[in-house]
Structure formats: C-alpha cells, structure tokens
Amino acid sequence: MASNKILGIDLGTTNSAFAVMEGDEPEIIANAEGDRTTPSVVAFADDGERLVGKPAKNQAVQNPDRTIQSIKRHMGEDGYTVEIGDEEYTPEQVSAMILQKIKRDAEEYLGDDVEKAVITVPAYFNDKQRQATKDAGEIAGFEVERIVNEPTAASMAYGLDDESDQTVLVYDLGGGTFDVSVLDLGGGVYEVVATNGDNDLGGDDWDEALIDHLAKEFKNNHGIDLREDRQALQRLKDAAEEAKIELSSKKETTVNLPFITATDSGPVHLEQSITRATFENLTSDLIERTVNPTEQALSDADYSKSDIDEVILVGGSTRMPQVQEQVEALVGQEPKKNVNPDEAVALGAAVQGGVLSGDVDDIVLLDVTPLSLGIEVKGGLFERLIEKNTTIPTEESKVFTTAADNQTSVNVRVFQGEREIAEENELLGAFQLSGIPPAPAGTPQIEVSFNIDENGIVNVEAEDQGSGNAESITIEGGVGLSDEEIDQMQEEAEKHKEEDEARRERIEARNEAETSIQRAETLLEENEEELDDDELVADIEAAIEDVEEVLEDEDADTDEIESATEALTEELQEIGKQMYEGQAAQAGPGGAGGAAGAGPGGMGGMGGAAGPGGAGGAGPGGADADDEEYVDADFEDVDDEDDA
C-alpha cells in the first residue's frame, strides 16, 4: 500500500537527508544505519555488489577506483559519465542510486510504499541541472512533485511556527555549492526576493585546500607525492575532512596517518599539526568568493544589511568559524543557530510536501528563477525574455521578425545566464521553426514564449503568426533523457533493487543458520546428561553437519540454506518437547516457557531456534531484528525595433 505522504529530500553533494510530515511537524527520518544524514557516496565492490551511503564511504580507502563521491557537482553536465569496470554511469543514474536507498529506508520507516517526493536543489542551479535532478528522482521510482530551492526550503523549516513579518537572508554553504537568498516571510507566505550563488564552491574546496597543503608538506619532507597514490589520496581526503570538522571547535588538530606510503627503507608515516589560523589562511580565497554573491543578492533585492531581520545558516560547512564571522561582517548581525544546518533543507522540503499533499495549510511559496532566460539574436547577442529573480511560475513572450529577405526558417537557441553575448551563457537547447512564408525582411511576426513551471523547468515555443506554424521545446536534462531512457533506467534500478534484496535475504538466512548451529551445540553441551535419546542426538548432530555443509557451499542459494536450517530447527523442537515433558511437573505453572525456543521468539535461557523469530530469544523479527543492511536565428526584435 502506498503512503499518501510526500517525502522531502535534500539531495546533497556530500550528505543527503530526508524527512516527512508527522502531524504538524516535519521529522527527519533516520536511515537503515540509524543516522540522520546519509553520505552521498556510491561504490561497487569487486563482486559487483553496489554499496550506497555509509557502507560505501567506509570502504573508500580500500576501493577508491570504484567509489563515486560528490556526483552532484556534475549534474546536468553534458557527456559526463563515471566509468566503473565495463559500465558507464551518468550523474543522474548515480544520484538515483542514492535516492533509491533513501526511498527504501523511508518505506521501512513508514511501513508503506513511498511514491512521491519533493527534492531540493541549489538556488543557483540552472535548468539543465534541475531537469537532471528530476530525472534522477524518476529513475529511482519517485513521482517528483516539486523541485524546490534549498535556501527556500530552509526558510520554511525556520519559519513554520512564526507568523511575524520579517526579511530573512539564507546563507547556504554545502559540500559542493553556495547559495544566498533573500526572502520576505509573513502570514504563511514565503516570497523569494533575490538569489545568487556559486555552483562551484563548497566544503569540498576547503578539504581540497587542506589536502594540497598536507601533500605539499609531505613531498617537501619525503620527496613523495601522495596525490599519485589513489589509496593514499583517499586517506588524505578523509583525514582533511575530519581535520576541517575538528578545527570548527578546536584551535589546533593533528593529522596522523601511519603507513601512508613506503620506500625502500620501510614505511613512511604522516603526522602534521594544523592550526585553525593556518587553515583559515589556506582558505581565505574561498571565503572571499562568498562575498560578492551575498552583496549581489542584497542589491538585487534592493535591501541594505540593516533591512535583514534574521540570518539563517544552512549546510554543514557553515559550522566553520571563519564562515560565521564572514556572514556577521557582511550582514551586521550574528546568524541564527536554532536550525540544524544539516537538516533544515530536508525539513523544509517535507513542509512543502505537506503543502502539496494537503497536510499543511496556509503556506504559500513564491520562489524565483535564479538566472535570466532568453534567446540568441542577430550578432550573437543574448535577448532576455525572463529576467533573473522573477517569481515563478511565470510566462513571458516577445515578437521577433526575420533579418533577411525570404527567410523561411529560424533557429531558436535558448540560453540562461547574465552575460550579454549569448555564447557566454549556458545553452539550454535549440529548435528550428520552419514553414515561414517567404517575405521581405522584417515582415514575418514570430512570437517566442517562455514558460517556467513551479519546478523551474523551462518550456519555449515559437509561433509564426502568419502561417500558424509553431515549434516548442522542453529543456531536457544533462543527457537529454527521453521517456524511454528514463523507463529503461527505472527498470535497471528496479533490477538492482531486487538483487540487493536477494543478497540481503541470503545474508539473513546465513545469519539464522549460523545462530541455529550455535544454539544447537550449546544445547547439546549444556544438557548432555538429560538427553538420553542417542538417536535424536545423532539426528541433531547430522542436521548441524548438513547446515555447515550448506554454509560452506558458496553456490548454495537462500532456499537451500533455509531448508537445512529448518530441518535443524525441527530436530531442536523435538528435544524441546522431550525436555518440556520431563520438566513440566517440576517447573510448576509457567515454568515450561524455558524450553529450547519452544515459545514464541525462542527463549533466552537455554536458547533455540524453534519459535517465531527463532534464534534463541531474538523475539519477533528474529535474529535479523538488529542486523545492519550490507549491504541554438537570426531575427529582429520587433518590440524594441533593434536589429536582432
């Protein structure tokens, strides 16, 4: 049965989080590992097993060539793939693997299928990146109800219970992107006034600066470049990230990596102290890159820093003291610290999900498009139809004409950005409008219309008003995924899901079998004197051997393991029956519950695997109850009468 809840997902560069509305409040859902955030990491073991999240991150040092991290930085990037063995994966596919885990873990928590989601993106993501994110969600099996800007979502989490009118600046520095948004909040209306940012700036860059420093120092001291060793580099990356985190609360930390490499003389260790002052000096250029977007957002909103009532920090990287100090210097006030920077975006996404499902009333979200949208006109200029920071959804149109006599077609090239030369902006897509009746230049009337929906997805149409001929385009994602391609990827994703479930079932069966052997051997040892049925004891010992043989057979499937375990369980039940009969008179009322797992859930005294749940008192759900999962037009602008 499908849940009517809409999952809110913060699909992050380094970590992801997900939440759902529970009553009137959004709640973070812990993943299968019990954590409130999930590393955005995917890995492939040598045997083909796919690992996602914490298990993938934990094995990155041993398996760096088959581990994928920070894939969000490549969303919507034309032609980008990651090669693992004989397979190539697009950013959408890798992101879908992360989203699949999120979907599975959420379903486990809710006890129902989860079909719908709100997924957040950096406010400064362009249309390709937004569409790519939506594609990833669909590949993972979600109906993506809405794409929401991360700072906007965070403000919803912050202002859910606050009806006062106020202007809020959201400073969002995540693992791979930086956004700053100015919003007006009041009466349940969340209106984004302006947004700016840098899609190539995030916590990963702080890590990289520290990695460069440590590697340089090590090379100066030992003549070895650790960057040329993938395993050493991964260890260095993990250590740099940990040091960055520690320096948020400490003035100094030590990076200690024994046996980082070796020479003919033996192993070489890395041990180096890093002070916060050194780290901040190494990354001063990075923090400086946040200044202009912040000032530009205030300028675009026509606000001064004194107009800002509250400052909200979003993203784990905002925990760095230098970031908090920079924000305070820019805005003139100390940021709010009552919102968890790692969880605020997911919580806000859940709120938006609640709005869409009808569970949350009286909230209106008015978001904006972060970059201007337009087309290339004569001379390669960029003609804007929709200006940046326009509230969405929106639609704008403009009439153009031909620039040459008897021109019967025009190529419409759609761009997004703020540069005056079209080619210096991001090309989103192109299409051709044909069938224009031959006429002198300047005669045809061609109306170009832009429409942006609530997800920030762009639709463009061009119509020759004389002939009525029209063509349109919906800007596709980074790889231009068709519906058929998405369907195929969904099937592949579903196939992996089934493989993962089958692998998990086999592991659980092995665990149950091993536990049953242990319980049986313990029973025989501890009750040797009371067991006088030699034939039954021999049968149990034979059943134990059968289970051991199946466990030693690497080709044995789940059914074979379960069958052997069941046979052993039946033998144990027989012993339980005999011991029950022998003890009942002495035990008194209720005493017989101690017999060899004969009662529900097995039992804790003597142990056993007979009852529901099995495995000696594991209780309902059995031995696996506490197990971890392993697991591009020449024309003229008629409106302005400029050559175009």
Curated annotation (Swiss-Prot):
Database matches in Pfam families: HSP70 (PF00012)
Compositional bias per record (Gly residues), positions renumbered to this chain: 588-622
Composition bias, Acidic residues: 523-533, 624-644
Keywords from the UniProt entry: ATP-binding, Chaperone, Nucleotide-binding
Region (Disordered): 490-533, 570-644
Gene Ontology MF terms in the entry: ATP binding; ATP-dependent protein folding chaperone; unfolded protein binding
Domain of life: Archaea
Biased composition (Basic and acidic residues): 492-513
Family listed: Belongs to the heat shock protein 70 family.
Role according to the record: Acts as a chaperone.
Protein name stated in the entry: Chaperone protein DnaK
